[in-house]
Amino acid sequence: MYGKFCRQLDDKNRIVIPTKFLRDLGEEFYITAGFDQALVLRSEAEFEKFKAKLEATNKLNKNMRELTRYIFANTEEVKSDRLGRITLPKHFLDNFTITKEIVFIGSGNYCELFAKEIYDKKEAQFKDAKKIDELADELFKNGIEL
């Protein structure tokens, strides 16, 4: 998935999923707590792969147990209605400071959902060409050539 879309919550905490993403996610999909104050939306198939990786982690490692517990406790299976809307659970709204405006961004095989205020701060770093060069250098150091 790729692209960026802005949406607004309605009074019933419903949000319209961008059609482009809904095609990949399917009618029923999963929302999980992500990193960087984002929620992550995954298709059922992608969620099963993700779940298998989490379940295969070393349970003797306390940090892995805690992170796995946190992610599974903050996972919801959702189903879109005929208008492509889902209702965001209150705990997601509270924990991820989502009020009204939301930004969906494609992140490869999943999409992320941010409160607009949070995403705007993250995107601002890319207005600095030096920062982009630093991040590109990190990719290169990790074996990814652009």
Curated annotation (Swiss-Prot):
Among the GO biological process terms of this entry, one is: negative regulation of DNA-templated transcription initiation
Q: Could you cite one Gene Ontology molecular function of this protein?
A: transcription cis-regulatory region binding
| CC per GO annotation | cytoplasm; nucleoid
Which SUPFAM superfamilies has this protein been placed in?
A: AbrB/MazE/MraZ-like
**Gene3D superfamilies linked to this entry:** Transcriptional regulator MraZ domain
Q: Which residues form the SpoVT-AbrB domain?
A: 4-46, 75-118
| Xref: Pfam families | MraZ
Q: Does the keyword Disulfide bond apply?
A: no
Q: Which stretch is the leader sequence? A: none
> Can you say where in the cell this protein is located?
Cytoplasm, Nucleoid
Keywords from the UniProt entry: Cytoplasm, DNA-binding, Repeat, Transcription, Transcription regulation
Supply the InterPro entries for this chain: MraZ, MraZ_C, MraZ_dom, MraZ_N, MraZ_sf, SpoVT-AbrB_dom, SpoVT-AbrB_sf
Q: Which family does it belong to?
A: Belongs to the MraZ family.
Task: Give the record's subunit note.
Answer: Forms oligomers.
Q: What is this protein called?
A: Transcriptional regulator MraZ
Source organism? Metamycoplasma arthritidis (strain 158L3-1)
User: What does the record give as the organism's lineage?
Assistant: Bacteria, Bacillati, Mycoplasmatota, Mycoplasmoidales, Metamycoplasmataceae
